[in-house]
């Protein structure tokens, strides 16, 4: 296989970092992954020990890589008081004025809940402080790209799912109780989801096509837009026996949030489940090509079957 180049994944232990690294390695890149500890070795990936608090560590991890996947993230309740912006600034500094390409995972927080078709040219009008933070961080990347310091490519996606994730919507909510499916919204409300193996391949595809793109790009990954009813049906299809169905107890999450800061922040984003916000991008669809995404039932079966193993 021809070597496509070298990529560094900052935050290799995170869900996005792992799947992006796997996709780049499978596509023929030399892959480095940086984190404080090598929690899960990935075939074809060189681990580099480093701390995201250290510009020097990140600069060393980036080295001669042409592409950097910024998969760093902070705990959900630690985004505030300038922490996320400071992390973004450190990565920009570590990139230097080299013209290298950064690929950055965006999300839907930037947009008003009333928006139904969320396209790249849609106005960014965040509903919550968390969305305002994301808007500021993306502007920092755009400013660095406009200055000519680097190329910045944002790939925006919905909620993640994949086999064997911990701390995700299935592990913590939808399938947290044995024998029960907790529907996160009314059954007729759609939601944007991203199957992480597909999203990882999309990161690689954009990196490979980077020379055909502008200095700053904002892409929206359509993934799978499905209603909670369709989600429940896909889980039932993959389950070894029929599961009871109930509504996710958002009121309970709110009460837990009085004592648990992470749950408090999760509940603040409840509005995303009450509004069908569909990510759309015909330009990205053309780059990725037809039939890019894993079929929904297949992706869901792979994701949920481990929950039923041995049952």
What does each model-found stretch correspond to?
Residues 38-98:
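NAD(P)H-binding glycine-rich loop region in Rossmannoid oxidoreductase-like domains
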Residues 5-26:
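N-terminal Rossmann NAD(P)H-binding glycine-rich loop of SDR-like oxidoreductase domains
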Residues 130, 158-165, 185-197, 207, ...:
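Glycine-rich "substrate-gating" loop/helix at the edge of Rossmann-like oxidoreductase active sites
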Residues 1-6, 202-266, 286, 293-311:
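Mid/C-terminal beta-alpha module of Rossmann-like enzyme folds, strongest
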Residues 107, 139-163:
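Conserved beta-loop-beta element that borders a ligand/cofactor-binding pocket
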Residues 10, 34, 71, 104-107, ...:
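SDR active-site strand-loop-helix element
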Residues 88-135, 153:
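Conserved Rossmann-fold NAD(P)-dependent oxidoreductase catalytic core, especially the SDR/UDP-sugar
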Residues 174-194, 198, 205, 212-214:
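A conserved pocket-lining segment of Rossmann-fold NAD(P)-dependent short-chain dehydrogenase/reductase
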